[in-house]
């Protein structure tokens, strides 16, 4: 089963006129991984896509917050030293915030009910994550140690 099968499909997405709406999906990592890229997608009422991680030890981290613009259809690639490292059991949360009000300059008509659909005037959202899974916990832990050492070295060097 792919991670795409784990997230809600938002078939019940419904945004009332002149309002905002928030939808959230979660996925629990069944093995350690790192995120090397992400690509969000929403339509005209999309405002933000927020990707967060809740780690098994209870720590929380903001992975990315995309200030959405429908004309932006590109991927974000992480450099090696900042790729999020996710241990097994990490909960990934993707929050999508929609703005169907006059405050949204992309919104063609805030007086419309908005439903899930493929047309630009409908709404949808998905987030594609480029993930590399580790089959070996030791390899993952070694990368975590190397990253920690690199960060300590950068701090000591003043950067």
Protein language model regions, located:
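His-enriched metal-coordination microenvironments in redox/metal-binding proteins
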Residues: 1-140, 147-159
